[in-house]
Amino acid sequence: MKEPIQKYFQVGTIQWMTHPPVSYPVCDSVRTICCDPYFGALEITHIPDSEARERVKKMLDQSHLWVCYGAQPNLLGKGLNPNHLEETERRKAEEELTRAVDEAAYMGPGVSLFWQENGNLIPGNRHIPSF
């Protein structure tokens, strides 16, 4: 193949996997990815610090990247399952997913939302409309 892979694919990375927050400040890692022409897509997840979240939002607004929001860390980290047999447990997962949708919507109108359950990616994505 003589052409760059970007001719055929939109190469992306999962920010919180390739740049774990324990080792890399979230704003620094997002800036690095935004400035790298190799990437055309980026998956982010919950950013607990509101100041950092605002800085990341501004960077993503100015970037060339297609952005996805991964809700799986929000669920898996707390042991939540939207298909749990107990209604109270399903409600907890639903509340967490609702918070994830709200944060994804805040991060920008073009952000897509993904979540993963039991190791299987749920087909498709949920496009977050602009509010």
Write out the residue ranges for each language-model feature:
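Conserved beta-strand positions
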Residues: 13, 42-44, 114
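Short, surface-exposed, polar/charged, turn-prone segments marking secondary-structure boundaries
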Residues: 42-44, 70-73, 95-99
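Acidic (Asp/Glu)-rich catalytic clusters
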Residues: 2-8, 27-37, 49-74, 101-108
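Glycine-/proline-rich flexible loop or hinge segments
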Residues: 37-42, 77-86
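Short glycine-enriched loops at secondary-structure junctions
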Residues: 16-20, 69-74, 117-118
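Active-site mouth loops of central-metabolism enzymes
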Residues: 8-26, 80-94, 128-131
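Acidic-and-aromatic substrate-binding clefts and catalytic sites of carbohydrate-active enzymes
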Residues: 18-24, 43-55, 120-123
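Active-site acidic/histidine proton-transfer and metal-coordination neighborhood
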Residues: 2-3, 83-131
